[in-house]
Amino acid sequence: MSKLDDLIQKLCPDGVEYKPLSEIFNTRNGYTPSKKEKNFWENGTVPWFRMEDIRENGGILDHAMQYVSINAIKGDPFPANSIIVATSATIGEHALITVPSIANQRFTYLMIKNQYRNEYDPKFLYYYCFKLDEYCKECLNQGNFASVDMKKFSKFQFPRLPMEIQREIVGVLDNYTEVTAKIKASLEKELVARQKQYEFYRDKLLTFDVLRGGTIDFRWRMLCEIADISTGNSNTNEA
């Protein structure tokens, strides 16, 4: 039995309690300040998150690719340690935002209610939201534009675990995340090296120049001499 199993057996002898999303979090939609107001987008101090931020910088974010001025904010920025969940367009993405911020309208903010603030580790909630991502994909409204059924969204269940268990889970997942990142970085370096190797040999093999000890006997031909050339067909009646 693992340490986690021991903790659950010890601290949750009657099983794990679950609470709906709507009980644990306040939710608000993100928004985009008016592009017509240039002062909203100049000398910005408030991070404004988009899907590009997650794709570029990962799922735990403390800065954005774009900032807006405080004048662009409706009320106050959303609080630090909120979670943004993609509930329209690209479904199945989320991030933990560790600074006060806003995000565009593709996201719904999950802001933990005061009475639960000391009961949850933000990183545990971040990791558990990977299950929420999958749930969202199964709760879509019917229509041409992908969006999550927010009534069903509000009913998603979060476990109410003792903080000791949450931190144990976070520690294990942090370790796996770190190992995975190192492997990915190593593979990316290997890929770059192999690409350079490929380009070197490709250029070498396709360069017919004077070699040490002699020459290569070759002749150049115009493309039109060795190939028939035609353009593609734009006939829309063809399959």
For the regions a protein language model found, what residue spans apply to each?
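A short beta-sheet element
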Residues: 50-51, 62-130
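Short, solvent-exposed loop/turn positions at domain surfaces
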Residues: 10-12, 35, 71-72, 96, ...
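Basic, amphipathic alpha-helical recognition segments used for DNA target recognition
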Residues: 20-25, 56, 60, 99-100, ...
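Amphipathic alpha-helical segments
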Residues: 15-17, 121, 154-199, 206, ...
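DNA target-recognition patches
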Residues: 22-25, 35-69, 224-230, 234-239
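Short, recurring structural edge motifs at helix starts
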Residues: 6-13, 35-38, 144-145, 154-160, ...
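Non-catalytic DNA-recognition/assembly elements of restriction-modification systems
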Residues: 8-31, 213-233
